[in-house]
Amino acid sequence: AESAYQAWKAGAAIVHIHVRDDEGKPSYDIDKYHETIERIRAHKDCDVCINITSSGKENGDDEERIRPIRELLPELASFDCGSLNWQHRSIFENHPRFLEKLGTELKELNVKPEIEIFDAGMVYNAIHYMKTGLLKTPCHFQIVLGAAGGMTNTVENLVYLKSILPEGCTWAGCGIGSGHMPMMLATIALGGHLRVGLEDNVYYHRGVLAESNAQLVARAKRLLEEAGLQAATPDEAREIYGLTRKVF
């Protein structure tokens, strides 16, 4: 919660939330989610948009993946639009049954899906769900490159994935690990929004660990300013993405 608050102070418009258990392992513990979100919302000066993951750890069942979103009503929630061999060691499963459940609940709760894309097939899965009405348009896509099992973090892959996104949708890009900086710069050049943070990359420079999420946010903000752009405020992000602000 404190990391999210400091990231907002550094310029983040949206914070993406995972929780861990007391041993530091990824968790779906609903009490941890409540504690984390309530601590963020307790900062009355903080108007950051909250995005809760639907994929907090491997092998979660449908209900425990959806429950934090249902109970805490974020403005966004991740919607990983397909399955893949994750890190060459397990299956990151997003069964069509689960995606139907998740998409239906997000519509009912008025929570915007953050459609995470790890390869081109996931874009076409999203287009299918747009046609069936499961995903309400205009959609928001998060292109994630460099995860082992997904598309590699090259500019060519980013340009290609951007080219097949449905017209009128918003998008953001990010690179995992060593691709973090190249994909951030390419995303800025292509007119996308940015995602940065320790979930994707723990290094600030080669061999130098990042101090915090806030440090990575501050660098992204500086790069935008060097390009003649400005980081969006939370309210500007709400307008850009078509979010419904939740008041508690």
Language-model regions: role of each:
Residues 159, 163-164, 185-248:
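Structured C-terminal cap/extension of enzyme domains
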Residues 76-199, 210-212:
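Catalytic alpha/beta core domains of metabolic enzymes, predominantly
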Residues 1, 25-52, 100-108, 160-168, ...:
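Alpha-helix-loop-beta-strand connector modules within alpha/beta enzyme cores
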Residues 9-14, 74, 191-192:
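A structural motif
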Residues 1-5, 60-70, 180-184:
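Short, acidic/polar
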Residues 13-36, 86, 144-145, 202-206:
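Glycine-rich, proline-tolerant flexible connector loops at the mouths of alpha/beta enzymes
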Residues 24-93:
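Active-site beta->alpha loop and helix N-cap motifs at the rims of alpha/beta catalytic domains
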